[in-house]
Amino acid sequence: MTQIAQLSEAEIEARFRVMGTKPVAFLIAGFAKEREPFSVHFGAGGEMFLTTPLAVEPEKGLLIFDCSGSVESNQRFLRSDRNIFIGRPGGVHVQFTTGAAREVAHEGGKAFAVALPQYIVRLQRREYFRVETPRVNPLEFFGRLADGSLLKLPVHDISISGLGVDAAVLPEGVMPGVVLPNCHFSLPGDGKDMFFSATIRNTLELERRSGARHWRIGMQFNDLSSGDETRIQRYIARIERERHELS
């Protein structure tokens, strides 16, 4: 299953939003008709399961969708008050957020129901597709701050326009708008470093399931070559293919 990193609020531009009760209901009803698969992320993003929209009840403002195959996961999901749905119908990144779910009966079986989201984000531009990098032997990002101090951080997600890195604590001097010159990293099996400058776009403090807190730092490539963009695209395609084979 393709794993696309969740977009931060700062990265979601208004022009990509589909808003209004009728347009939102119409779009999701289409996903239900085609049985488009989605992943639903909950528990502060620490848990997820695969689901399929089953029906939309516009008069009640409800979305009905499949339960997980795990009783324990379903119980934890029902305690979540913020859930993020991510899918790629027709190759287009689709994402929306809902509130808490409740269990309902649907066509003789159990299902979940949530209030329809206020809006849906649809991103078709290739530079907005981000993929989470493998957690085993992660990519390592190298950069330098203005004072010359070295940054060496594991990469959480990557696209042809930028990447996200994780840090146990926010490094001194790291803030949105700061430009990092002479950055580089190497893709697994590639053996050739990519060199570029990067602009920090956002920083976000997150909490793991264990309760430990860490930082996610989003960066934009400034001068990546077209050849390096192609190498990143191939890397993303390989990750998606391998994950699909394992699903």
Curated annotation (Swiss-Prot):
| Keyword Transmembrane helix annotated | no
Ranges for domain PilZ come to 124-237
Source domain of life: Bacteria
GO terms for biological process, alphabetical: bacterial-type flagellum-dependent cell motility; regulation of bacterial-type flagellum-dependent cell motility by regulation of motor speed
Which InterPro entries does the protein's record reference? PilZ_domain (IPR009875), Split_barrel_FMN-bd (IPR012349), T3SS_YcgR (IPR023787), T3SS_YcgR_PilZN (IPR009926)
* Assembly description: Monomer. Interacts with the flagellar basal bodies.
Localization, per the record, is: Bacterial flagellum basal body
Which keywords does this Swiss-Prot/TrEMBL entry list? Answer: Bacterial flagellum, c-di-GMP, Nucleotide-binding
Q: Which GO terms describe its cellular component?
A: bacterial-type flagellum basal body
Question: Is the keyword GTP-binding assigned to this protein?
Answer: no
GO molecular function of the protein, one example?
cyclic-di-GMP binding
Q: Report the protein's function.
A: Acts as a flagellar brake, regulating swimming and swarming in a bis-(3'-5') cyclic diguanylic acid (c-di-GMP)-dependent manner. Binds 1 c-di-GMP dimer per subunit. Increasing levels of c-di-GMP lead to decreased motility.
The organism named in the record is Dechloromonas aromatica (strain RCB)
Family classification: Belongs to the YcgR family.
Name by which UniProt lists this protein:
Flagellar brake protein YcgR 2
